[in-house]
A protein has these predicted regions:
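A general structural motif
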Residues: 1-3, 35, 72, 90-91
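N-terminal phosphate-binding or glycine-rich loops at protein starts, especially the Walker A/P-loop
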Residues: 2-41
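Structural motif
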Residues: 9-11, 40-44, 77-80, 97-99
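Anion (oxyanion) recognition and catalysis
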Residues: 31-32, 56, 111
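N-terminal beta-loop-helix "entrance" segment that forms/cooperates
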Residues: 38-61
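Short hydrophobic alpha-helical runs that function as membrane-insertion/retention elements
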Residues: 39-40, 63, 117-120
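Short acidic low-complexity segments
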Residues: 59-71
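Phosphate/diphosphate ligand-binding glycine-rich loop within oxidoreductases
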Residues: 73-122
Length: 122
């Protein structure tokens, strides 16, 4: 069975959005077997005093936001926007708060690009 590669993105295209999908306090509680398949956005934990070098020790590594969107199987992105989905790989999975009813453009981009959206509140 193939293990999917997971991207964790902390930045948002929404103004003043600063929440993170995974609190850095929980990093070491994630099983090592899963951590090997998780790549974080560059600078993800720096506001908490955790440098990228530490994330590279704990996880598969760090990479720029656009690269993660374009290359990973599953992307944790808390407040995704239509522009994010346009950059994400076709057929990929995005997990966060898509708000499909309120964001019709986002929903249409996901349909057109055959993407799967998973809502945290579901």
């Amino acid at each position: 069975m193939t293990t999917l590669e997971l991207a964790v993105i902390g930045s948002s295209l929404l103004e003043n959005e600063q929440r993170l999908p995974i609190d850095p306090a929980h990093f070491e509680g994630i099983p090592p077997g899963l951590r090997r398949h998780m790549t974080f956005e560059q600078g993800y934990a720096e506001p908490f005093g955790i440098p990228d070098a530490r994330l590279e020790q704990l996880f598969a590594g760090v990479a720029p936001r656009d690269e993660l969107l374009a290359t990973r199987d599953v992307v944790l992105l808390h407040k995704m926007q239509a522009a994010d989905l346009a950059l994400a790989r076709e057929g990929g999975v995005l997990w966060g708060w898509p708000h499909c009813v309120q964001q019709r453009e986002l929903t249409q981009v996901a349909i057109d690009r055959r993407q799967t959206l998973i809502a945290w509140e579901a």
